Amino acid sequence: MCIYSISVSSSIVWKPCATPSGKIITGDYAPDHPHQHGLFFAWTKSNFRDKPTEFWNQKKKLGDIRFHQFLGKTENKKSLSLQFEQIFTAGKDFDQPILKETWKITVPGKELPHHQFDLTSIQSCATEDPLIIQRYHYGGMAIRGNDQWLKLDEDGNLLGNMISSDGKNPK
């Protein structure tokens, strides 16, 4: 189950997301990363008009992502889709849109033996000037995991075990 929460003064926050057994897998404002919540785009190292921008660490105020408008819903026997537009700004130095993003969230219309949603994000420049996304070791679509993943067992080991799609542990 996923619930979206929207306010005109903030970005779209898509949370909580749960496993089929009901365990919440997304989190927000974790003590070690208080600037992350739900599902979001993390363009960590970028430039607009030769000035640094960042959409990962909100405390720096070098970038902001805001809900702009609800574009509508489509409902039929197969699915329900919601569409929203967000705008990215360069934060405190440039409050005008530099990037537009459309989210389309589709949920199957029939009961399935599992929970599922499809999220499509389309991003495009909002000005003639491009947002330059620089190479970095992380970035793009991100998920703020549940803070329970950071809890330690009796031996001081993380209770959560994160592996890549290749079955590798990132540590």
Feature map (PLM): residue ranges:
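Beta-strand-rich N-terminal accessory domains
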Residues: 1-35, 120
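Extended, loop-rich substrate-binding clefts of extracytoplasmic carbohydrate-active enzymes
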Residues: 31, 35-113
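Structured loops at beta-to-helix junctions and adjacent beta-edge loops in soluble globular domains
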Residues: 20, 85-87, 144-146
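Short, surface-exposed linear segments at secondary-structure transitions and domain or protein termini
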Residues: 11-16, 108-113, 145
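Residues that flank catalytic or metal-binding motifs in active/ligand-binding sites
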Residues: 13, 117-119, 137-139
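Active-site/ligand-binding surface loops and adjacent short beta/alpha elements
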Residues: 130-171
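Short, surface-exposed beta-strand/loop "edge" segments at domain boundaries and coil↔beta transitions
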Residues: 2, 23-27, 88-99, 151-152
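Asparagine-centered strand-capping/turn motif at beta-strand->loop junctions
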Residues: 123-125
